[in-house]
């Protein structure tokens, strides 16, 4: 009995014709982020001109942990420079902030800009890595494909990793203060998402360090502030995009601060989402930092 090969050959030819298109789609990944006019994104993987990725030995585990540094060309020898410590969101990198518009504004304003990894890029800077959402709050969606783990891997205990995450930030701060002539009255802290929650924690725990703190789309689930909270002594900026599912919890946090008459600014950026707020809010962040110098005695 003779079998026709025409259908199978047609199927094979069709598959071969489709393969390039399938490969192209697979390589495209997520669509590019769309920023407002005048905002530049940049890479979270490859450092741009003027940005260094450095490493140091983290004593508790002996691992080499990364941090990123940008130094404005406006800084002169012997001149005290303002410093910004930047904390990435969940699965981000040390370049989450140290790129694009943030670098442009740091250059223009004469800042040193430093991105810490927080032991690794899934740890919470002293806060549990995956906070439990408050009632009625929707956390941002998890990425479909988890980005690679960056940073320390030797420690596996969640509580220890959380403590190491905080310790890494403070280690990096200490290293930078020793290397550069830092203006102690102009040390600022900024964080996004998980890093925003971490920035709130570090501001609360070390209030005498920071001249101001900026929380961009921060993970603030179940956070309560009282009149005795140390963070009430620090000028604070809250920024969120109107397309971000976290906007409700951040509004609630701002309302807590209003009730306590805490000095802070709350900005909702039109058209921005959980990711684009990072670069999209930087002009407001730098204007906010420029207005705040830590008092001699707080």
Task: List each model region and its residues.
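Alpha/beta-hydrolase fold active-site loops
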Residues: 82, 111, 211, 234-235
